[in-house]
Amino acid sequence: MITLKRLVGSSIVLAMLVILLGAYTRLTDAGLGCPDWPGCYGFLKVPEQAHHIEQAEALYPDRPVESHKAWNEMIHRYFAGTLGLLILAIFLFSLKHKRLLLPSLLLALVIFQAALGMWTVTLALHPVVVMGHLLGGFTLLSLLALYWWQLQPAPFIAVKHSLKFLFWPVLLVLAAQIALGGWTAANYAALACIQLPVCEAGWTSQLNFDEAFSLHLGYDNYEYGVMSQSARATVHVMHRVGAVITLLVVAAYAIALWRNSSGLIKTLSLTVLLLLLLQFSLGLANVVLHLPLANAVAHNFVAANLVMCLVVIGYQLHRNKESAYV
């Protein structure tokens, strides 16, 4: 059991690192730094010698080797592959403990994540795939956290009964907002509006929902986006509106939990509230500072931790039937 706990704990840390590297890869426009998968220009690592670069560019004449982008992509793949091996080890160690639901889900999800990583390249950054890959990473982190807590003794929870059931709509609101954020990033719409509080003057007359939420099938390459400016602005505006709704809903829930609980739930609810305020501030900074790299990566990372903490709260509220609900 100790070995299993250590494996899960290590996987959580590694999953966080993979999420950071994934955001960095995307934000440095390195998603196609290697135009093939799982290698890079036909090599196991980035080609660096002159004759290897010549071979690579002969194989992909439309994709000249950009070493820094290729390394960003390959480092992300190396760490993601290591995470996959750790999760396989978790599954194998879990066989003797007879708790296979979460390990099985984790193994299935990490395999699907690998497939999404491949499709990200082979489908040239299709927005649906990119968004799905991001959501899959967040889900993987949350499931790892759930499994870690499943391996711990169940704490006694005392909260109002209504707060247990309110968890699900609150989680849905947060998940929808994260999906909007992923759609914004995947369609290169983060700088479609650079004024506060909503967008540039006259934005209401430019809203284009049909194009903003179209699947945009049939393009050969989605790098840097295929949407019109009006569609990108629409996506951006909806993400801002969603941010305000999410701030109000999740903050109200976290405050209610904090006021009506103790121990672990009280600590987690305060953590959610602080992460929520930090995330909203990072979003504002992205607009005001025109998407600085470190800030944008942090915005992605805090979102992952926010959903993880909220999911853990939900798990703790539902796991112990002997807990007191009043």
Regions found by a protein language model. Give the residues of each.
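Small-polar-interrupted transmembrane alpha-helices in polytopic inner-membrane proteins
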Residues: 10-21, 102-120, 169-177, 267-285
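N-terminal signal-anchor transmembrane alpha helix
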Residues: 6-38, 173-184
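Membrane-interface helix-loop-helix junctions at transmembrane boundaries of multi-pass membrane enzymes
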Residues: 92-104, 161, 254-272
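Membrane-interface loop-to-helix entry segments
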Residues: 71-88, 128-140, 234-252, 296-305
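Interfacial helix-loop-helix junctions of multi-pass membrane proteins
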Residues: 24-36, 114-134, 184-195, 232, ...
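A juxtamembrane structural motif centered on a specific transmembrane helix
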Residues: 146-163, 308-326
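Extracytosolic (periplasmic/ER-lumenal) interhelical loops and adjacent juxtamembrane/interface segments
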Residues: 30-73, 190-231
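Long, hydrophobic, well-ordered secondary-structure blocks that form the structural core
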Residues: 101-146, 150-153
